[in-house]
A protein has these predicted regions:
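N-terminal binding-site loop/beta-alpha segment at the start of enzyme catalytic domains
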Residues: 1-77, 115
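Active-site beta-loop-alpha junctions enriched in small/polar residues
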Residues: 21-23, 53-55, 82-86, 122-125
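Conserved catalytic core of Hanks-type protein kinase domains
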Residues: 42, 82, 111
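Generic structural signal for helix capping and beta-alpha/helix-loop junctions
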Residues: 59, 86-89, 129
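Generic beta-strand or strand-like secondary-structure segments
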Residues: 64-68, 82, 100-107
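Structural motif corresponding to the early beta-alpha repeats
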Residues: 72-98
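Glycine/proline-rich, positively charged
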Residues: 92-137
Length: 137
């Protein structure tokens, strides 16, 4: 696997990443055991940059991914998640406040069974007030 430096972060990430939206059943249903095994296979083959969001499957993707990550050494993967877009029971919500972003980070860490997140992205900024994102989120 080819790796590249990610800006000035000091992180070296693979040129391909593992997008975990499917773990939340976003595109179709998936057996949890197969979802977890797909994470193990990806990391084993060098796809160790994993991207997820609380919005994917309305928290399910992070929850399933967390079951896989607790079985892996923390240094074996780089993790990215998002703040700003949430939803449950088919209701989409956006909240770009600093307070909600901070709460979301801690909630994600709990679901993901980790003690830190390597990268945090702001999800779907086109629905936001950019001044709030820049100055608060």
């Amino acid at each position: 696997m080819e790796y590249r430096e990610l800006g000035k972060t000091g992180l070296k990430v693979p040129v391909l990443s593992y997008g975990a939206s499917s773990l939340g059943g976003v595109f179709h249903s998936i057996k949890e055991s197969e979802a977890i095994q797909s994470v193990f296979t990806a990391v084993e083959h060098g796809l160790n940059f994993i991207d997820v969001s609380p919005y994917y499957g309305h928290y399910k993707a992070e929850t399933v991914l967390g079951k896989a990550l607790k079985e892996l050494p923390r240094e074996s993967f780089i993790l990215s998640t998002k703040v700003g877009r949430y939803g449950k029971d088919g209701v989409n919500t956006w909240d770009y406040s600093g307070k909600r972003a901070q709460e979301s980070v801690y909630e994600s860490m709990e679901r993901l069974n980790i003690d830190h997140i390597d990268l945090i992205n702001v999800h779907d900024v086109e629905f936001s007030d950019m001044n709030q994102v820049v100055n608060e989120t």
